[in-house]
A protein has these predicted regions:
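Catalytic metal-binding/acid-base residues of hydrolase active sites
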Residues: 58, 94, 124, 189-191, ...
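Serine-dependent carboxylesterase/thioesterase catalytic core
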Residues: 9, 68-173, 216
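Hydrophobic/aromatic beta-strand patches that form the interior of the parallel beta-sheet core
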Residues: 6, 53, 119, 186-188, ...
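C-terminal catalytic-base region of ester-bond hydrolases, centering on the histidine
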Residues: 178-277
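Active-site catalytic motif of lipid deacylating hydrolases and related acyltransferases
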Residues: 1-86
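A structural motif corresponding to the C-terminal end of an alpha-helix
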Residues: 44-51, 174-183
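Short secondary-structure boundary/capping segments
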Residues: 21-24, 133-137, 201-204
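Short catalytic/ligand-binding loop motif for oxyanion handling, primarily in non-cytosolic enzymes
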Residues: 14-16, 62-63, 96-98, 126-130, ...
Length: 277
């Protein structure tokens, strides 16, 4: 039987205002699960017999805080299920949360020993040129947001130079190489063209395209690969929101309606789950 699956969300989950009010993370109501960041994916996987949970980490916070939150999530799930290990399927920054969690806890609780697999979907392992651009060009806006008490530390942690420093840290490289013996790592990317990408992602799409090429409107294929040995493939005609089941009118240019997209994405996640330990 497959170990429990945790769906780890990205940096700014857009269902943040509804998740507590409607208990979206734990709902067993399909209609409510369709409002979740991972649109109906938990319900679909549960119907196939998997034990599935959602992560719940701080909105737009830095990686240290988010990694701690994710660790607490996993420990609670391990206690509740009495499972020996957990599978993580992470979208976007959720993959970085998991990597930092495993590394930070390597000499303490050794949470990595309880992670059977880490699958990342469009995770910016090499950072995001859009984060670089935002911090370099929108400093006044960023300062105003901070004065309002809104934590956007995640943007700094998503800078390309910050991610490069982490990836090239000798201790990180040695640790993650050792982890391959007990944890299955695999990565996926998404890509879309300018006309098909969600309207709100067209500016970051162009910023990323000019420096890193093919991307999904938030993360380049290059950044999502992590290591070539882990890379499983690219979802074509799929932007950053499509990857978690959310349709937008621009997708009509790919001749794909909302029901067709959702079914395709659900099939994608079901395929991943079917190969997990």
């Amino acid at each position: 039987m497959t170990y429990p699956i945790v769906l780890a969300h990205g940096v700014c989950r857009f269902d943040v205002l509804l998740k507590d009010t409607l208990n979206l993370d734990n709902t067993d109501t399909p209609e409510l699960d369709n409002l979740h960041y991972f649109k109906g994916i938990r319900t679909m996987l549960k119907n196939k017999g998997y034990v599935v949970y959602h992560s719940n980490v701080a909105w737009a916070a830095g990686l240290e805080k988010r990694a701690d939150d994710l660790k607490e999530n996993l420990l609670n799930i391990l206690k509740e299920t009495r499972a020996k290990k957990i599978n993580i399927i992470a979208h976007s920054m959720g993959g970085l949360d998991a990597r930092h969690m495993m590394f930070n806890d390597r000499n303490d609780g050794e949470i990595h020993k309880y992670v059977a697999s880490l699958t990342t979907i469009s995770t910016p392992h090499e950072g995001s040129p859009f984060a670089d651009w935002g911090l370099d060009n929108l400093t006044s806006l960023h300062s105003l947001i901070q004065k309002l008490g809104i934590d956007l530390s995640a943007l700094k942690d998503l800078r390309t130079d910050t991610c490069k420093t982490f990836n090239e840290h000798q201790a990180v490289k040695e640790f993650e190489t050792t982890c391959k013996d007990t944890t299955k790592f695999q990565t996926y990317a998404g890509k879309q063209n300018f006309w098909g990408v969600f309207s709100g992602l067209k500016i970051p799409f162009e910023i990323i395209r000019k420096t890193e090429g093919e991307n999904d409107g938030m993360v380049s294929v290059r950044s999502a690969r992590w290591r070539d040995e882990y890379f499983k493939g690219t979802m074509d005609k799929t932007d950053h929101l499509n990857e978690i089941g959310w349709w937008d009118p621009d997708q009509l240019l790919a001749n794909e309606g909302p029901e067709e997209l959702l079914q395709r994405i659900h099939n994608f996640y079901a395929g991943i789950a079917g190969q997990l330990p």
